Amino acid sequence: MKPFTILNGIAALLDRPNVDTDQIIPKQFLRKIERTGFGVHLFHDWRYLDDAGTKLNPDFSLNQERYKGASILITRDNFGCGSSREHAPWALEDYGFRAIIAPSYADIFFNNCFKNGMLPVILKSEEVEELFHLVSTNVGAKVIVDLDKQTVTGPTGKIYYFEVDSFRKYCLYNGLDDIGLTLKQESKIGEFEKKQKEVEPWLYAI
């Protein structure tokens, strides 16, 4: 998993509350377990005018030229609600997003973001509203998300502070998913297995 330290990038605006996981990545695209290849289907029903995904909807915000290459998504309350599907953060990350800024998230989606190397930042509703205004009126300006300092710096330099669990922060900062965390204990696991073989050898008789 790629470490998350400081993200300095274009922020795209999605001015919709209660965006559910079926809107993030529709169910017909959940036919594989690899984490790549989902970005093209992100927000499919909003991004495209046809089922085949060949005609872009010019009215959808992410299709605007100003948001090309965006790595930060700023959106509204209760983002990621609906059914539990890890494909939702996969699709967002595969599209290019590394951080999301919103007033609130659905719990399962929130947890899945951390497990997949993406930072879901929670700011107050009025702070998100201010960022919406600043980003919309400063075309080409970038937003900075600093995990170490736990800050978001807006286009005009104003700083917003956010909270993050210390363990999740450690994992993101060091690029550790569940497998990576387990591998860090590989030597201790080996020591345990060695002792267990001596005490309970029948467990390894196969």
Swiss-Prot record:
Lineage of the species this protein comes from: Bacteria, Pseudomonadati, Spirochaetota, Spirochaetia, Leptospirales
PANTHER family cross-referenced by the UniProt entry: 3-ISOPROPYLMALATE DEHYDRATASE SMALL SUBUNIT (PTHR43345:SF5), 3-ISOPROPYLMALATE DEHYDRATASE SMALL SUBUNIT 2-RELATED-RELATED (PTHR43345)
Organism of this sequence: Leptospira interrogans serogroup Icterohaemorrhagiae serovar Lai (strain 56601)
Catalytic activity, as annotated: (2R,3S)-3-isopropylmalate = (2S)-2-isopropylmalate
The name this protein goes by in its record: 3-isopropylmalate dehydratase small subunit
Pathways involved: Amino-acid biosynthesis; L-leucine biosynthesis; L-leucine from 3-methyl-2-oxobutanoate: step 2/4
Function: Catalyzes the isomerization between 2-isopropylmalate and 3-isopropylmalate, via the formation of 2-isopropylmaleate.
GO terms, biological process: L-leucine biosynthetic process
Top-level taxon in the UniProt lineage: Bacteria
